[in-house]
C-alpha cells in the first residue's frame, strides 16, 4: 500500500526491444541473481523523455534507439525496509516510475555497458518478454508485470525486419 506520507524518488524506466522483440536486461554489480531493465532518476527540471534518453546512454551506452511509447501513469514500488537506509541516504521509501518503450535501431556492437566510469551493469543480454518477470528482483516484479501489460502488444506489432 502506498502512503501519502512517504516520498518516492521520480524515476524513468526503459524497455528497450530489438528487432526480434526481445528486451534488453542487465545484471547489476550488486547482484549475482537478478537482472533488470535500465532505469534511473529524473534530474531537477529534466523532461521525462530527456531523462530516459540520458539513462539509456549512461546505462546501455547507446543512443541507437527511438521512443515508441510512454506509459500513462506513474508506477510506484516500495524498497524493502532493510534497503531504505542504504539507498539515497534513506530519503525515499521507493520509486515512482514512468516507463518508455524504445526500439533498438543499432547492432549489438553499438551497446557499451562500460560507457561511463561507473557502469550500472556487469553483463547484459536480450531476454524474451515472457521470461522477463522471472529474472527480476522480487520487489520489482509487479512493476515489470504492469510494464509488460502496457507495452507487449506494441512490441509484437513493431517487430521489424533486419
UniProtKB/Swiss-Prot annotation:
The keyword Hydrolase belongs to this UniProt entry's keyword annotation: yes
Domain Nudix hydrolase: 7-149
Molecular function terms from GO: bis(5'-adenosyl)-pentaphosphatase activity; guanosine-3',5'-bis(diphosphate) 3'-diphosphatase activity
GO terms (BP aspect): nucleoside phosphate metabolic process; ribose phosphate metabolic process
UniProt keyword list: Hydrolase
Stored Gene3D superfamilies: Nucleoside Triphosphate Pyrophosphohydrolase
Needed co-factor(s): a divalent metal cation
InterPro entries: Nudix_hydrolase (IPR020476), NUDIX_hydrolase-like_dom_sf (IPR015797), NUDIX_hydrolase_CS (IPR020084), NUDIX_hydrolase_dom (IPR000086), RppH (IPR022927)
Pfam families in the cross-refs: NUDIX (PF00293)
Domain of life: Bacteria
PROSITE patterns found in the cross-reference section: NUDIX (PS51462), NUDIX_BOX (PS00893)
Motif (Nudix box): 40-61
Hydrolase recorded as keyword: yes
EC identifiers of the protein: 3.6.1.-
HAMAP family to which the protein is assigned, alphabetical: Nudix_RppH (MF_00298)
PANTHER family associated with the record: NUDIX HYDROLASE 26, CHLOROPLASTIC (PTHR11839:SF22), UDP/ADP-SUGAR PYROPHOSPHATASE (PTHR11839)
Family membership: Belongs to the Nudix hydrolase family. RppH subfamily.
Primary role: Accelerates the degradation of transcripts by removing pyrophosphate from the 5'-end of triphosphorylated RNA, leading to a more labile monophosphorylated state that can stimulate subsequent ribonuclease cleavage.
UniProt name for this protein: RNA pyrophosphohydrolase
Gene source species: Wolbachia pipientis subsp. Culex pipiens (strain wPip)
Amino acid at each position: 500500500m502506498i502512503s501519502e506520507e512517504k516520498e518516492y524518488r521520480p524515476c524513468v524506466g526503459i524497455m528497450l526491444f530489438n528487432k526480434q522483440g526481445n528486451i534488453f536486461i542487465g545484471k547489476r554489480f550488486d547482484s549475482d541473481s537478478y537482472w533488470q531493465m535500465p532505469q534511473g532518476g529524473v534530474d531537477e527540471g529534466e523532461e521525462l523523455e530527456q531523462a530516459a534518453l540520458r539513462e539509456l546512454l549512461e546505462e546501455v551506452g547507446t543512443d541507437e534507439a527511438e521512443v515508441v511509447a510512454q506509459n500513462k501513469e506513474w508506477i510506484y514500488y516500495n524498497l524493502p525496509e532493510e534497503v531504505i537506509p542504504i539507498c539515497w541516504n534513506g530519503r525515499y521509501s521507493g520509486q515512482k516510475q514512468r516507463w518508455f518503450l524504445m526500439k533498438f535501431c543499432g547492432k549489438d556492437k553499438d551497446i557499451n555497458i562500460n560507457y561511463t566510469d561507473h557502469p550500472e551493469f556487469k553483463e547484459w543480454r536480450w531476454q524474451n518478454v515472457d521470461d522477463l518477470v522471472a529474472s527480476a528482483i522480487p520487489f520489482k516484479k509487479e512493476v515489470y508485470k504492469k510494464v509488460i501489460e502496457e507495452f507487449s502488444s506494441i512490441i509484437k506489432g513493431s517487430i521489424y525486419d533486419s
